From Swiss-Prot:
ATP binds at residue 605. NCBIfam families: ileS. Keywords: Aminoacyl-tRNA synthetase, ATP-binding, Cytoplasm, Ligase, Metal-binding, Nucleotide-binding, Protein biosynthesis, Zinc. Binds 1 zinc ion per subunit. Its main location: cytoplasm. It is found in: Cytoplasm. It comes from Syntrophotalea carbinolica (strain DSM 2380 / NBRC 103641 / GraBd1). This is Isoleucine--tRNA ligase.
Amino acid sequence: MDYKQTLNLPDTQFPMRGNLPKREPEILEKWQSMGLYEKMEEAGRTRPNFTLHDGPPYANGHIHIGHALNKILKDIVLKSRRMKGFYAPYVPGWDCHGLPIELMVDKKLGKKKRDMTKVEIRKECRVYADQWVKIQSEEFERLGVMGEWDRPYLTMTHHYEAVTARELARFVEKGGLFKGKKPIHWCSSCVTALAEAEVEYADHKSPSIYVKFPFDGELPAELNDLAGRKLSFVIWTTTPWTIPANLAVCLNPNLPYAVVETGDELLVMAEGLVSGVMQELGLENYRVLKTFEAPIFERKTCRHPFYDRPSLLILGDHVTLEAGTGCVHTAPGHGQDDYVVGLAYGLDVYNPVDNYGRYYEDVEFFGGMKINQANGAVNAKLTEVGALLKESEVSHSYPHCWRCKKPIIFRATEQWFISMEANGLREKALGHINDVNWVPRWGRDRIYNMVENRPDWCISRQRSWGVPITIFYCAKCGEALEDSKVMDYVADLFEEGGSDLWFDKPAKELMPAGTTCPGCGHDEFTKETDILDVWFDSGVSHAAVLDNRDYLSWPADLYLEGSDQHRGWFHSSLLASVGTRELTPYKSVLTHGFVVDGKGKKMSKSVGNVVAPEEVIKKYGAEILRLWVAAQDYRDDIRISNEILQRLSDAYRRIRNTARYILGNLSGFDPSRDMVADDQLLELDRWALAKLEDLAGRVEKAYEDYEFHIIYHAVHNFCSVEMSSFYLDVLKDRLYVSGTDSIARRSAQTAMYRILDCITRLIAPVLSFTAEEIWAFMPGERSESVHLGEFVQFPTSFRDAALEERYDNLLEIRSDVSKALELARNEKVIGHSLDARVLLSAPAGATLELLEKYRDQLASLFIVSQVELVDDLADGLTGENLPDLKVKVEKALGEKCERCWNYATSVGDSAEHPALCHRCVAVLTDR
């Protein structure tokens, strides 16, 4: 007789292979056809709200691996919150204005752009941005990210532009907006001001020069004995091109300075830097003649090296001993510290450089010259006049434009600023930073330091594609009309016709009838031509999105972006909200690191180490990308490589195989009919459910705390160690051999059903496709998608400290027995573990008591045919985990049962089934 037909062997159509690249699009199609996101939304409307506000990526180019990391993290957060009983809508957004898009359109238009109006150029930009919104939307959806893809927020919609204009009006209303001439980051290539967040630092080689500024005037009384001698203050700079803009030399009021004699010359520098500077200048024969305190030279003058004008000696605390000479070349038009200290001394904010990075034509010696080519000419002039002491080259970190990657400059121009001091914006923002939960905690210090030290916010840009700064100027007296009511009127027009109106219509048609200049009464006006910084655009998204969709909450529960956004979107959103509402727009801020290659190196097309999301999806599926996101501690830089993805693919396979094995053994199981009551479950099954409950608690807490890597390790460990290596392995005999409806088998199936049901829900936020696939194969009545369900609640706890402690000890004994079985296998005593009879001995005590309590279950726990407790095993193997345990493995007694493969002395006792053991005969008799 073929006894295989009498066994309860696993049976499932759930595929062994994930074949994710093919299967995932089918699942996406199913979600779309069933309207899954809409059903999730509908089901959650009455629940507590959890709003994650999406930071808008640029609508420009295909998504990269950093985008994938960010969107998947957000999706994991939202899905886990929904499964925890929250209403968690997701409104994706796109940043549609700004330089990245305008430059791409410029490139596309080429020479045609010269003959186009601003409105025509803006229309091209809108078409371009719209095209990339659609492409990126599909790419994000392919990752399994669920949201309102058909109703995103775009910073270029009429409504959004109107809100942006209104938020600017609120700053005007509160007196926070002003126009001034200050040095700002300027890109001569892109011809526009740049925000702090648009500046990247990269290694750059610059000239390094030491220059003499000859003292001109009467020496202080303390140095009278040096009268008549040639005295010069020595400065050091890496920007020779700024020497034509020099107006002062700055000293630290609290540092001692030295007069150094070198031949017939006297050089002034900080005393603490003398030896280093002299070594750098190659001067060995020198001596310090005098030391003095800097204030004795305050407001005295040097001569500019090659212009006939004074260079004022001033004092400033920003001067340090970290580099240079302690005498700082000061050009108020080309540096923030220079500007601030220059204001204190009434210096002109002089800038001799135009928008394109050329000296103005009237700049003596260098007129019309590009500054990046002027360093050599300036050095030559300094040499000619005998002022250059040393010229060399230095490699250092230097600011570059984030778009064109070219070095930028500090340059004073007329710009619009939001004041950090008016209405106490800086102080209020710093205070509110402490109201926010920063994850990780160091995020708080990072943004605090940035806000504490940042200059006024330059919000004007000299480009076409953006929301205009809705300020008018009197055509007669030139005064700016900073009137919030007029600005609100314009915003209402934008609501209907968009901000293109600003560039299309004359000022008269954009203003309320009867508007006159408050200064001179004139009624003719011109319009501001600058547009708003895109960081202001995205910074007001809390007002444009959260305040305008009634199903979202303000402030948001969470902002989640890369760590670069402490100086970007987190920063601009904080200032935009505190400046108008005196509240933060977010309760919590979570940041992740950057994606690097497997060796921890930055990704670069030139190096060839870029990992593209679409390539990963084609090879492994989006699911492995999602698992990669969850498996990493995202707070640091996150590594990715084929090796890492392959390792995760193997881990995924183990999780999938665990699910498949359980599904196979749930064949024919109907939860409504076959579930065993909690108090009827076998002890091993109760232990498994206790471990499940522990896992569920840890995983749910990890979701709540955004510790996703804990989830990956916990679930993977549970599936591969506690389930596959022990529990499911031990269950095989009971599941396959026991009677179909026996309590032993139904108890195991009940536990497995509950385990799979719980785990499928637990992994759904991460392995969204696979969880859905498992869900479709689960027995019993259930919702049409796992994503419409919630995490499992345990109304009756299975946790039992005494039970879990007993099984911890049994597992240690099992580990020692497994080692003994492996030795016996190597010595050819046995082949399979079922060939074995295990002898155990232990002295009186806890171990022996445990063995005696579980005497009848030990064989199934060890997956051997027989276990016998004996008084003494002198030749037994000493346990590694339990040194008082002795283990010996022998060949099992009796014959091998053809049905269960266990050895038993009862095989042959049955005339009807002579090849079976008593247990199998009993099962067949009861059928």
